[in-house]
From Swiss-Prot:
GO terms for cellular component: ribonucleoprotein complex; ribosome. Belongs to the universal ribosomal protein uL5 family. Transmembrane segments: none annotated. This is one of the proteins that bind and probably mediate the attachment of the 5S RNA into the large ribosomal subunit, where it forms part of the central protuberance. In the 70S ribosome it contacts protein S13 of the 30S subunit (bridge B1b), connecting the 2 subunits; this bridge is implicated in subunit movement. Contacts the P site tRNA; the 5S rRNA and some of its associated proteins might help stabilize positioning of ribosome-bound tRNAs. Part of the 50S ribosomal subunit; part of the 5S rRNA/L5/L18/L25 subcomplex. Contacts the 5S rRNA and the P site tRNA. Forms a bridge to the 30S subunit in the 70S ribosome. GO terms for molecular function: rRNA binding; structural constituent of ribosome; tRNA binding. InterPro entries: Ribosomal_uL5, Ribosomal_uL5_bac-type, Ribosomal_uL5_C, Ribosomal_uL5_CS, Ribosomal_uL5_dom_sf, Ribosomal_uL5_N. Keywords: Ribonucleoprotein, Ribosomal protein, RNA-binding, rRNA-binding, tRNA-binding. This is Large ribosomal subunit protein uL5.
Length: 186
């Protein structure tokens, strides 16, 4: 069994040993606190079929919990929208916010295992930054993660992945993610 007290995620130790120094040299920061770091990763799964069957949100939350290694929170509608047959407080999806060691573990699994399993994968878009150093991407199917059993999946669901950093600009955030071997196309 692993000794939990001495365990450090691979990307966290990579950040401490190599990434910080490379970013400090590349952007010539004067203070170590200026060096960008990962803040959190948010996984969001919207379930459109939840309007007809609210049980699908629970199965989506269970799958998202297995992927993240942390319990998912069910999200509810803020307002009623008659055109979409949505009532206020109706469950519509689920989300998980990862921080600390779980965040580094998830990013490692995403980059090394899940993204290469995506069909016709050539890399992720390099222009999906929000202008403040956060990166957003989407996956069309949840079974690119090894935690999901293909035979037990009722419905193919996609998810949004938002990687929040402390970087001030998109260039700094992209350099940080490139140091973690994020496979950008451009």
């Amino acid at each position: 069994m692993l000794d939990q007290t001495n365990y450090t995620p691979r990307l966290k130790s990579l950040y401490a040993s190599n990434v910080r120094a490379a970013l400090k040299e590349q952007f010539s920061y004067k203070n170590d606190m200026q060096i960008p770091r990962l803040d959190k990763i948010v996984l969001n799964m919207g379930v459109g079929e939840a309007v007809k069957d609210t049980k699908k949100v629970k199965t989506a939350a269970e799958e998202l919990s297995m992927i993240a290694g942390q319990k998912a929170v069910i999200t509810h509608a803020k307002k009623s929208i008659a055109g979409f047959r949505v009532r206020e407080l109706m469950p519509l999806g689920c989300k998980v916010t990862l921080r600390g060691d779980r965040m580094y573990e998830f990013l490692d699994r995403l980059i090394t295992i899940a993204l290469p399993r995506v069909r016709d994968f050539r890399g992720v878009k390099g222009n999906s930054f929000d202008g403040r150093g956060n990166y957003a991407m989407g996956l069309k199917e949840q079974f690119v993660f090894p935690e999901i059993n293909f035979d037990k999946v009722d419905e193919v669901l996609g998810m949004d992945i938002i990687i929040c950093t402390t970087a001030k600009t998109d260039a700094e955030a992209k350099a940080l993610l490139k140091q973690f071997n994020m496979p950008f196309v451009s």
